[in-house]
């Protein structure tokens, strides 16, 4: 039986991870390990200065007092009896498109699976009301089944964004590149009840590159976007120019 590790960044009790677990349980044995609280925006952070504590829940899930990356690392290195065949992260409440991927704990959980040598997928639901987790779950299962039947290179992560629509209104799947956002909006300055100054990060910037071919464009037009991501951040096109610059300094 195929074995799949499921994690997320919204927390182990979030509706998205439940929908994903149930959908994948129809085709695989699933171990669900997620953070014990919402860790949105945690990116690839690891907990290095405190121990990781776990709680085995009545539904079989395992909660971890740690980050999404902690969850996947701990699950594969210690909690799994053997190894998973794949790591799937989500279903995130909110899109992870364009620059979002740099901050996303959902993408980071999948990335940790890839670091440890396993095929990995991140699934996110784009919208405001988050009414159609089941639509995302159906597409997640379809994509996972495709990967099991025809594996892709292990050095990539599939970043999947699903529009928050009824299943019959989703037009299909498009392979996309990452779009881009404008810089985030300003910091919100306020006070706590004791009158002390506090700050909130402003909302993300609006789309800057949402042209045809981007994840933003596909999802806005009713398609599921799939973007292959790599963890190699090297700007290969700049190596020669940089060497020429270094030679002159």
Swiss-Prot record:
Ubl conjugation keyword on record: no
GO cellular component, one term: cytoplasm
Reactions this protein catalyses: a ribonucleoside 5'-phosphate + H2O = a ribonucleoside + phosphate
Keywords: Cytoplasm, Hydrolase, Metal-binding, Nucleotide-binding
InterPro entries in the record: SurE (IPR030048), SurE-like_Pase/nucleotidase (IPR002828), SurE-like_sf (IPR036523)
Pfam families according to UniProt: SurE
Subcellular compartments: Cytoplasm
Cofactor: binding details: Binds 1 divalent metal cation per subunit.
Function recorded in the entry: Nucleotidase that shows phosphatase activity on nucleoside 5'-monophosphates.
Similarity-based family: Belongs to the SurE nucleotidase family.
Name the UniProt record assigns to this protein: 5'-nucleotidase SurE
The encoding gene: surE
């Amino acid at each position: 039986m195929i074995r799949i590790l499921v994690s997320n960044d919204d927390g182990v009790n979030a509706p998205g991870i439940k929908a994903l677990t149930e959908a994948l349980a129809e085709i695989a044995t699933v171990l669900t390990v997620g953070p014990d609280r919402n860790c949105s925006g945690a990116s690839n952070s690891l907990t290095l200065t405190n121990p990781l504590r776990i709680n085995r829940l009545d539904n079989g899930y395992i909660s971890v007092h740690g980050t999404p990356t902690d969850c996947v690392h701990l699950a594969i290195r210690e909690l799994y009896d053997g190894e998973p065949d794949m790591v799937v992260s989500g279903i995130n409440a909110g899109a992870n498109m364009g620059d979002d991927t740099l901050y996303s704990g959902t993408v980071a959980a999948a990335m940790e699976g890839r670091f440890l040598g396993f095929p990995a997928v991140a699934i996110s639901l784009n919208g405001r009301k988050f009414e159609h987790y089941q639509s995302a779950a159906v597409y997640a299962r379809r994509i996972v089944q495709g990967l099991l039947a025809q594996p892709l290179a292990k050095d990539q992560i599939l970043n999947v964004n699903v529009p928050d629509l009824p299943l019959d209104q989703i037009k299909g799947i498009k392979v996309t590149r990452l779009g881009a956002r404008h810089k985030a909006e300003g910091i919100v300055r306020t006070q706590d009840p004791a009158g002390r100054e506090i700050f909130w990060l402003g909302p993300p910037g609006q789309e800057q590159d949402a042209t045809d071919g981007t994840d933003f464009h596909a999802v806005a037009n009713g398609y599921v976007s799939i973007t292959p991501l790599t963890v190699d951040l090297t700007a290969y096109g700049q190596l020669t120019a940089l060497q020429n610059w270094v030679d002159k300094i």
